[in-house]
C-alpha cells in the first residue's frame, strides 16, 4: 500500500488500507512501538478520508481506523455510514461499522449490521471478522453460549485470531464452563503474552464502562490476571 501511495499520492483506498494494517497489528498485539504506530495509523486514516470523500473503500477502512486508533467512534461511524450510502453492497462497511457500534455500546444495531454482512457475502474471505464481531456483540448482550459458539467459528477460520480467543475464554467462564475457558486463556497467553485485564482499555476502544467491566470479569474468571 505504501508503494501504491508513492506512485499515486492521492490514492485514497491505499491510505485507508495502510491505516487499517495498523488496526490489525494493534488488535493482534503485534505493535512494537504502540504510540508511534497508532499515530501513523491515524495520519494515514485522515489522509484516506481527505482524499476519498466519495470512495467507499477509503471511508470504510479510514473510518474504522479512526474509530479504533483515535477512539473517535462517532466520527468513524459517520464515515462508514457515508460509505454505505455510496456502496450498500460493500460488505466490509457493514461489518466494520458493526464493530464500531459494538464498541459504542449499540449491540442490537451492531448485530443487524453484522448479520447483513454475512448474508451479503457468505463466502467472504473476512468471514472470521464477521463471526468475531457477532461473538463480541453477543458477549456484551450477555448471551454467553452464543458468544462462545461464534468465537469458536471465528477461530475455526483463523486460529490465531486474538479477539476470538479472548471472547471464547470470557464467554465460557461466565457461562460456568471453566475447562474450555482455561483452554482459551492459554491460547490468549500464547498469542499475546502482554494482554491482561489492566490493558483491555488500551487494546479495544470500548466506550461503556459496564462492557469493559464485563470483559474483565470474564477473563478474570477464566484465569487471566
Predicted region positions:
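Short, well-ordered coil↔helix boundary/capping segments
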Residues: 159, 175-182, 206-209
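Terminal, low-structured helical/coil segments at or just beyond the last alpha-helical repeat
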Residues: 197-225
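Acidic, Ser/Thr-rich low-complexity linear motifs
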Residues: 29-33, 127-128, 193-208
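Acidic, proline/glycine-rich low-complexity intrinsically disordered segments
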Residues: 1-175
Amino acid at each position: 500500500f505504501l508503494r501504491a501511495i508513492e506512485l499515486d499520492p492521492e490514492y485514497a483506498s491505499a491510505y485507508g488500507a495502510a491505516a487499517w494494517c495498523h488496526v490489525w497489528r494493534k488488535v493482534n498485539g503485534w505493535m512494537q512501538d504502540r504510540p508511534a504506530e497508532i499515530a501513523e495509523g491515524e495520519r494515514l486514516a485522515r489522509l484516506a478520508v481527505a482524499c476519498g470523500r466519495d470512495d467507499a473503500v477509503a471511508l470504510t477502512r479510514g473510518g474504522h481506523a479512526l474509530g479504533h486508533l483515535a477512539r473517535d467512534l462517532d466520527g468513524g461511524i459517520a464515515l462508514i455510514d457515508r460509505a454505505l450510502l455510496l456502496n450498500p453492497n460493500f460488505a466490509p462497511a457493514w461489518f466494520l461499522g458493526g464493530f464500531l457500534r459494538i464498541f459504542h455500546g449499540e449491540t442490537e444495531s451492531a448485530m443487524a449490521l453484522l448479520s447483513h454482512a454475512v448474508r451479503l457475502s457468505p463466502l467472504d474471505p473476512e468471514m472470521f471478522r464477521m463471526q468475531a464481531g457477532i461473538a463480541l456483540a453477543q458477549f456484551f448482550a450477555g448471551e454467553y453460549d452464543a458468544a462462545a459458539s461464534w468465537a469458536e467459528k471465528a477461530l475455526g477460520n483463523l486460529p490465531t485470531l486474538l479477539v476470538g480467543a479472548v471472547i471464547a475464554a470470557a464467554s465460557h467462564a461466565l457461562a460456568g464452563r471453566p475447562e474450555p475457558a482455561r483452554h482459551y486463556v492459554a491460547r490468549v497467553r500464547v498469542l499475546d503474552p502482554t494482554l491482561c485485564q489492566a490493558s483491555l482499555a488500551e487494546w479495544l476502544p470500548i466506550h461503556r464502562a459496564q462492557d469493559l467491566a464485563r470483559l474483565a470479569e470474564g477473563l478474570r474468571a477464566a484465569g487471566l490476571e
